[in-house]
Amino acid sequence: MTAPVWLASPPEVHSALLSAGPGPGSLQAAAAGWSALSAEYAAVAQELSVVVAAVGAGVWQGPSAELFVAAYVPYVAWLVQASADSAAAAGEHEAAAAGYVCALAEMPTLPELAANHLTHAVLVATNFFGINTIPIALNEADYVRMWVQAATVMSAYEAVVGAALVATPHTGPAPVIVKPGANEASNAVAAATITPFPFGELAKFLEMAAQAFTEVGELIMKSAEAWAVGFVELITGLVNFEPWLVLTGMIDMFFATVGFALGVFVLVPLLEFAVVLELAILSIGWIISNIFGAIPVLAGPLLGALAAAVVPGVAGVTGLAGLAAVPAVGAAAGAPAALVGSVAPVSGGVVSPQARLVSAVEPAPASTSVSVLASDRGAGALGFVGTAGKESVGQPAGLTVLADEFGDGAPVPMLPGSWGPDLVGVAGDGGLVSV
């Protein structure tokens, strides 16, 4: 609004509007709220600045810490700017409140204007022979002064409030901390796996059930009315001695009773059961479909984690690959120079436990080829029942004795295939028994 517009209205209008308003209390309350918000922004900015500085100083390390600092530094700057903007907004609200107080103080009051009008009326009423011409002119000039003063005050108040409104800063939106689209994958999975509850189908079924209940209720009411009509016919026939009317009344009462019982004891329970059954089917079907729909989504990460845990263990088994090839048994090596001695049977056929095969035996010539055959002692045909065993199996070379010096090992040594069956192992200190 401009000054001529303010001058177009009498001062009573401006004074009444200004004095009848809410007053400066609302502006001062808003200023206090903006001040509190500014302090809150400043406190949060200070606390977050400490955290960001600690992270940047090396409390956390790695790319996550760098991303954290890069995301929160702009947010801290926004908090500082928001605190400053809130403080400025509080100051502008206080300026507007002060402008209102000044305008109210400078505005001609309604009692002053009423007194001016009363004085003017008295002067005009007592203006005999023009004796009050000068006082009337002065009174009117004073009213013009108040008119101009009211317009000037309103113009000044408008300028102050307009300047405060223009100077009030507008805080922009906070910077984005979380990356856009970070939750799109989980939301997509949830949308794909969790289907909404079929409320539409439930509403249609309940509508049909309500219609069915209404029809059953009408059947019950009509049956009750028919029973009442039949009862009246029965009573009338009995009173007037009209057998056909009595018969008609009894028939009507019978069919009415059947319809009433059918509606109350059969149709109503069936409808209730149908409603409960439909609710159970919809609920159970929805739950089962969501559970089985979520199984593939949950199985993917679980199988990935399981594979990550199993693959290192399987990689450790690769060391067993060397066991696939068993070295072939070569030719018999030459006998050692000091071989276990000659076996001289003792009387009775028992060799003393302390007897050791200590005598020297000349080794076989190197050119002598010793056939290696497997021993036929102790083991039968191997494999499934009915399969034929193979006799052409390589024999162990040399004498293999599993006993030690203390007799703690196996008492029966493995004998070469060239030895006869006249020696068997017996319990003892590593000795042999001849038979």
Swiss-Prot record:
Which Pfam families does the record match to this protein?
PPE (PF00823), PPE-PPW (PF18878)
Which InterPro entries does the UniProt record give? PPE-PPW_C, PPE_dom, PPE_sf
Gene3D superfamilies found in the cross-reference section: PPE superfamily (1.20.1260.20)
Source domain of life is Bacteria
Which region is the signal sequence? none
Q: Which GO terms describe its biological process?
A: response to host immune response
Say which family it is in. Belongs to the mycobacterial PPE family.
Name of the protein: Uncharacterized PPE family protein PPE47/PPE48
